[in-house]
């Protein structure tokens, strides 16, 4: 997706050979026009899958996932990383390791929000090692629902996430695939 690549080049910041900072438009300050385009593109790529719901992880996945759900005219459900007073009984949970934050947490979705047989699309901001998507996939399985695809805004293709997901048989669609962050330069998979 050329608009996204342009935004990454112009407003992204390479912090190391492993970390790309995109808080100017994706995961702190959000560019609503870009999110609309991202939602439209994911909807175009997955429209044939007859999706019932979009799921993501709080917080950074919410903006692109919401716009995708809006375009597909389906509900969005986001997994919570922290329990609240209202998130109590009948939880579907998975352990997820965050590459960026270097912490493991338990994420949860209320069982009442995912039903057996529903067709689910995961949308997330980044793909590195694939742990977030694998955790969400485990929650989908617990619900007896069917994961029909995974939409990733930015994939770090030099990390093993895509391979881990594809080995499980999941369809992965990434809007920007980064080949390298070496030398503080972003290079894309062409």
Swiss-Prot record:
GO terms for biological process: purine ribonucleoside salvage; xanthine metabolic process; XMP salvage. 5-phospho-alpha-D-ribose 1-diphosphate binds at residues 128-132. Signal peptide: none annotated. GO terms for molecular function: xanthine phosphoribosyltransferase activity. Xanthine binds at residues 20, 27, 156. Keywords: Cytoplasm, Glycosyltransferase, Purine salvage, Transferase. Its EC number is 2.4.2.22. Pathway: Purine metabolism; XMP biosynthesis via salvage pathway; XMP from xanthine: step 1/1. It catalyses: XMP + diphosphate = xanthine + 5-phospho-alpha-D-ribose 1-diphosphate. It is found in: Cytoplasm. GO terms for cellular component: cytoplasm. It holds the Pfam family Pribosyltran. InterPro entries: PRibTrfase_dom (IPR000836), PRTase-like (IPR029057), Pur/Pyrimidine_PRTase (IPR050118), Xanthine_PRibTrfase (IPR010079). SUPFAM superfamilies: PRTase-like. Homodimer. Converts the preformed base xanthine, a product of nucleic acid breakdown, to xanthosine 5'-monophosphate (XMP), so it can be reused for RNA or DNA synthesis. Belongs to the purine/pyrimidine phosphoribosyltransferase family. Xpt subfamily. This is Xanthine phosphoribosyltransferase. It comes from Azotobacter vinelandii (strain DJ / ATCC BAA-1303).
